[in-house]
């Protein structure tokens, strides 16, 4: 894991075992991050690793967050299962005990039954959940790359259920889940293959409204639904259907749970990245990583480019986030 300053100079490198560190969580002068697909550690300010959490019978992937009790919620794959990247677990922060909170097969059984294993694949990656966001203590917003859909889950600790989805009504109609979709308030091209969906409360909004922002990779592909014709889906325009050159976007949605609607309120075109990538709103600006393009940039909210960094080597820059390390390394 590499730490750069605002001038693009490497200031620190933190070694890990394997896989990747997806992002950093802070709590009580301890910094938490993954060091493999099996372990998350807590590192103190001196560099001493004081906490080690093992994911047990699961492998972590893509994202983890604190819940309202500072337990760690983790996107996971069960090690011996035939499917992958479709479960959510909780690691109790004090004990390290693991609880499976949600299995997407239980929530979307009809859709699951329509998917098929691609040629050469070892596991059925039928949802490919790639981000987590906590809402009102007991709800989660998750992102499914494989279905180009954003999903809100309620009652995650007791009896999980789907509150709504943001995606294509044509895509979901066959399996009968199209009634869960929010309605678009205007004609815009929906997110495709998105990453890093982030929940934002805003006290200026009426109750039941909030923002979601995300990296819209803008690649409409579903390897476990190979017969679906994304090109003829009227929910998409200027969207790409192969790994060739294109344009990706920062998207910001206004969600209104009262009217069950979603509105695109902001969009910034960025370097194309068919997979991976991240976006972060911070101090009035937007930090955007186009992972496959090996570049990351900072923009003002109106889309003015402030700075861009590029690097070489490796396959991609998985994610880029900006931290001030206040009260951790700096006062």
Please place each PLM-identified region on the residue numbering.
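Histidine-/acidic-rich catalytic cores in large beta-rich domains
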Residues: 1-331
